[in-house]
């Protein structure tokens, strides 16, 4: 009879093979053991390293400890207290669950495990040795908690040991692991030593407030990061994104400040990283740089598979596209909110109630109160830059035939260079238009188009200093503010009720005052195209916005709606027009097209915007 070729490997060899996946270097050992301490409920963890971890790794914690009866199994393969069924595997919240780390580590090192639970009078120590990895137990002296010592890593696998880097390099990797874990666990104290010298000491925070968490982030990522970062809190259903994202000006040529976590588990997930980098594409971040961020994604554990990578560095989302778009929209909204505030500062129009530490951009968060979030917008709201403007290309649909005819004549006319029209205007004594209150560009005046066709009784003549439209009506000249015209056009378009669904519904929590205001605004908001549902949760009204007017789709909706609920605005179109994207450059064709559109729908309001100018004094001198 032939000797069988297939046989079962001895435990030590099997464990060493498994260690090839789990134990890559000393930092891998530290990660596995510290995660075990966290699962044990420890709030203070001591990490002692000697010679980069090759000589000694000692992890001491004050967790729940391991009873004598469980010590032997703790070092066995596929033995764990974390899961016991397939259903548990699909709902994992613990950091460890496979039950192979201690067995794998003990197969390539001299490992001793000393532990004592609170209900046990004395501590016991366990270690495994020999070909069969038999576990021996003996009494020891130890406080409540656990200490694991890993000595002479890879002593029995010389090939693995020779691939270790210098002590300094290996300790750098250990330091990074501790930093990553400490970022996710601000309520845990960590102490890291190397060769008897304390290198890191992170004290546990007093509470779980954002301010306390921020202290831990600053201690690890630096004050420069936290001073140039936006706090984000974005939620939709079972998805919750929170943390800090750095402004584009602190992006880095390397990805050493890219920290992402899923349900408290540190990882480098491609879906998360891609969504965040895509969100920064619309910013002025230098090409090739990496954004700086510390973000935490909380998700229903049944919607994510953490058992897809040997070292658990990656996960697989059941609805990857939804998660990607959720993160993308959250980060984009945060960056957009900051860009608006920065631009407001540039034009010296500060938002009075803005505070840096409030979560001003987290449109999906569930705990936004008016006293913290409402932002009062002045009449001179910051103007977005031209690169962020929607397409205002001229169109003739819905415009009167006379306007279409005029537009055809306009585009066929050559542009004639003329004298600066500003020099020809002498306003009446009581005329002080806002358009001339700003600093005037003294550069060469732009070409002016002069036309003879009229829109209704309006005859557009020229663009003045890129701020006003010069008109003639009934032998009288008028100036029309282009900014006010753009806002009026925005108002008239809002009344059409054209709406667009949100990819991720916007969730808002209202206080009592906001709730009263909401009750009076339900119908007007619905008429403008908003689709908003409400429900009561813990005595508080919560709104879910699923559809908004098309013109507001790209705006900071959370900020706008909370400001509306805090205001006493009656005309909603006028209120929303404050947020209209106003171009910084105008062509005569655009201005005429807007005039033609608005003249049809808001003629009386348009009449109120014109300001008469008198050329008689100039003409008398000619």
From Swiss-Prot:
Classification via Pfam families: DNA_mis_repair, HATPase_c_3, MutL_C
UniProt cross-references to InterPro entries, sorted A to Z: DNA_mismatch_repair_CS, DNA_mismatch_repair_MutL, DNA_mismatch_S5_2-like, HATPase_C_sf, MutL/Mlh/PMS, MutL/Mlh/Pms-like, MutL_C, MutL_C_dimsub
CDD domains membership: HATPase_MutL-MLH-PMS-like, MutL_Trans_MutL
GO molecular function, one term: mismatched DNA binding
Listed Gene3D superfamilies: 3.30.230.10, Histidine kinase-like ATPase, C-terminal domain, MutL, C-terminal domain, dimerisation subdomain, MutL, C-terminal domain, regulatory subdomain
GO biological process, one term: mismatch repair
GO cellular component: mismatch repair complex
Task performed by this protein: This protein is involved in the repair of mismatches in DNA. It is required for dam-dependent methyl-directed DNA mismatch repair. May act as a 'molecular matchmaker', a protein that promotes the formation of a stable complex between two or more DNA-binding proteins in an ATP-dependent manner without itself being part of a final effector complex.
Family indicated by similarity: Belongs to the DNA mismatch repair MutL/HexB family.
Protein name: DNA mismatch repair protein MutL
Originating species: Actinobacillus pleuropneumoniae serotype 3 (strain JL03)
């Amino acid at each position: 009879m032939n000797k069988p070729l297939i046989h079962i490997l001895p435990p030590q060899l099997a464990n060493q093979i498994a260690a090839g996946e789990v134990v890559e270097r000393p930092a891998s050992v530290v990660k596995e053991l510290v995660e075990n301490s966290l699962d044990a409920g420890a709030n203070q963890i001591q990490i002692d390293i000697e010679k980069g971890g090759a000589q000694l790794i000692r992890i001491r914690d004050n967790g729940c400890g391991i009873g004598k009866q469980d010590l032997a199994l703790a070092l066995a393969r596929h033995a764990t207290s974390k899961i016991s069924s397939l259903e548990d595997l699909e709902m994992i919240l613990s950091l460890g669950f496979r039950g192979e780390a201690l067995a794998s580590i003990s197969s390539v090192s001299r490992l001793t495990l000393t532990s004592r639970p609170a209900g046990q009078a004395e501590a016991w120590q366990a270690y495994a040795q020999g070909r069969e990895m038999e576990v021996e137990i003996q009494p020891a002296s130890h406080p409540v908690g656990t200490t694991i010592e890993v000595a002479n890593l890879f002593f029995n696998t010389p090939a693995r040991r020779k691939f270790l880097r210098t002590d300094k390099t290996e300790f750098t990797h250990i330091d990074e692991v501790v930093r990553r874990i400490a970022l996710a666990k601000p309520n845990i104290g960590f102490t890291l030593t190397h060769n008897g010298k304390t290198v890191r000491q992170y004290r546990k925070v007093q509470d779980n407030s954002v301010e306390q968490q921020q202290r831990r982030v600053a201690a690890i990522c630096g004050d420069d990061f936290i001073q140039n970062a936006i706090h984000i809190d974005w939620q939709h259903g079972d998805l919750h994104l929170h943390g800090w994202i750095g402004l584009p000006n602190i992006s880095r040529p390397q990805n050493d400040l890219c920290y992402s976590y899923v349900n408290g588990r540190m990882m480098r997930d491609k879906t998360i990283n891609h969504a965040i980098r895509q969100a920064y594409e619309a910013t002025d971040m230098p090409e090739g740089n990496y954004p700086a961020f510390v973000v935490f994604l909380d998700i229903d554990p049944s919607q994510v598979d953490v058992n897809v990578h040997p070292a658990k560095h990656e996960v697989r989302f059941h609805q990857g596209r939804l998660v990607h778009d959720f993160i993308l929209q959250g980060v984009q909204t945060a960056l957009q909110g900051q860009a608006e505030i920065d631009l407001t500062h540039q034009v010296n129009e500060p938002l009075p109630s803005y505070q840096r530490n409030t979560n001003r951009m987290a449109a999906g968060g569930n705990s936004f109160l008016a006293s913290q979030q409402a932002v009062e917008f002045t009449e001179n709201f910051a103007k977005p830059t031209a690169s962020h403007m929607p397409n205002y290309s001229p169109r003739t649909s819905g415009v009167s035939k006379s306007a279409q005819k005029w537009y055809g004549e306009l585009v066929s006319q050559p542009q004639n260079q003329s004298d600066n029209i500003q020099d020809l205007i002498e306003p009446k004594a009581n005329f002080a238009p806002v358009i001339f209150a700003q600093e005037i560009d003294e550069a060469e005046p732009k070409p002016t188009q002069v036309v003879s066709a009229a829109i209704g009784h309006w005859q557009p003549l020229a663009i003045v200093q890129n701020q006003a439209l010069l008109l003639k009506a009934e032998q009288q000249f008028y100036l029309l503010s282009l900014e006010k015209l753009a806002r009026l056009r925005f108002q008239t378009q809002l009344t059409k009720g054209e709406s667009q669904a949100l990819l991720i519904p916007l969730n808002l929590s209202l206080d009592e005052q906001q709730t009263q205001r909401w009750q009076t605004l339900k119908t007007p908001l619905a008429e403008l195209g908003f689709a908003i549902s409400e429900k009561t949760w813990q005595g508080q009204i919560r709104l879910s916005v699923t559809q908004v007017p098309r013109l507001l789709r790209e705006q900071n909706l959370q900020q706008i709606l909370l400001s509306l609920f805090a205001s006493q605005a009656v005309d909603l179109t006028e209120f929303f027009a404050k947020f209209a994207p106003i171009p910084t450059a105008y062509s005569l064709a655009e201005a005429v097209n807007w005039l033609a559109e608005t003249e049809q729908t808001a003629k009386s309001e348009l009449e109120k915007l014109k300001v008469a100018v008198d050329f008689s004094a100039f003409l008398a001198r000619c």
